[in-house]
Each structure stands twice: as structure tokens, then as C-alpha cells.
Amino acid sequence: MARSFYSHIREAWKTPKEGKLAELQWQRQQEWRDQGAIERIERPTRLDKARSLGYKAKQGVVVARVSVRKGTARKQRFKAGRRSKRQGVNKITRRKNLQRIAEERSGRKFRNLRVLNSYWVGEDGSQKWFEVILLDPEHGAIQNDDDLSWICDDSQRGRAYRGRTSAGQRGRGQQKRGKGTEHTRPSIRANDKRGK
């Protein structure tokens, strides 16, 4: 049976550090390091992944590449007194994953757009790159699209900041059900933060 064009792309991205893709990624990342933290791009780097998440090559659909530094939170040492438990500086981690942070930053950069989804495109020793798909809820091409028009509803405003994207739901424990998820619904906070 003949394989589709997208299946070959998907196969290559399963092992991005091997084969022809490894050299291509090495060249790309040299360019990405010189660019800004948030760059609007013409077309997705991973076309198969972007299309599976809802991307369409049409007006009103924007893709942005976002870089986020790796590592734990950079916490300043307190000048005033604290009890020992509250004095922590090292090993303090974020409560959000880096992908969710990338989505939020792109949402703040493009304020008139709404975040649809995002995916990983690369990383080096100090940062990770994600590509974020954003939609214009006021554009007629989006409003008349049967697959994408749902994002025009007012309930989808600020969805990246409220953990409504896939990365946000993953961080809130919403992608699992049943045993072990007793403290994740309706939210982490409603269960006195016992879900994390």
C-alpha cells in the first residue's frame, strides 16, 4: 500500500536527531538562535503535526515560532527573613510546562488572535522551540469554516491563559480519567492543590 507524504514526514520526526533531519535541524537552530523570542513564520516546520492539530493554509491562520529557556525558575534570594520552609531558592520549578508558557507568550504578542494549539520543533542545551498555531476570530474565513468557527465564540477568549489548550490540559491533569485523578476535577485549585 502506498504511503502518504505526511507519513514520511511523521516517520522522520520520530527520530529528529538521526538521518537527514538531524543535519537540517542543526542548520535551522543556528538561524533560530539569532532570531527573536517570538517569530511569525510563513509555513509550519512540521506540516503533518500542524495539520493534525487544525492548521489550514488559509487567511486568518497564523503560525509563530516561540523560544523558551529551559531549566527551573530563576528565583532571587530573599533580603528579608523567612522561615526555613519558605526560604527555598534552588530546585523551585514552574507549575506550568514550557509549551504552555510558549502559548501564553505568543498570545500576548498577537493580542487579536487566539491560540489553537502548539507543538515541539526543537531544543538545544539552553532553550526549547515550539510552533504555535493562532487564529483570527474576526476573519470571515475562520468564521465560515466548519472546523474552526468554534474558536470565534466568546467562551474561547484567553484560552491559552486558562489552560484550555492541549498543553494546558496536560499540565492540569485533564487528559486522564479514572483512578488517580480524584483531585484534578473540576480543577487543581478546587481540590486544595492536591492534584499536583
Swiss-Prot record:
Keyword DNA damage: no
Record-level GO cellular component terms: cytosolic large ribosomal subunit
Coiled coil regions, renumbered to chain: none
One of the protein's GO biological processes: cytoplasmic translation
InterPro entries the record matches: Rbsml_eL15_core_dom_sf, Ribosomal_eL15, Ribosomal_eL15_arc, Ribosomal_eL15_CS, Ribosomal_uL23/eL15/eS24_sf
Keywords: Ribonucleoprotein, Ribosomal protein
Keyword Secreted: no
Compositionally biased intervals (Basic and acidic residues): 179-196
Residue ranges of the region described as Disordered: 159-196
Domain of life of the source: Archaea
Name of one Pfam family that matches: Ribosomal_L15e
GO molecular function: RNA binding; structural constituent of ribosome
Similarity comment: family membership: Belongs to the eukaryotic ribosomal protein eL15 family.
Name of this protein: Large ribosomal subunit protein eL15
Organism (species): Natronomonas pharaonis (strain ATCC 35678 / DSM 2160 / CIP 103997 / JCM 8858 / NBRC 14720 / NCIMB 2260 / Gabara)
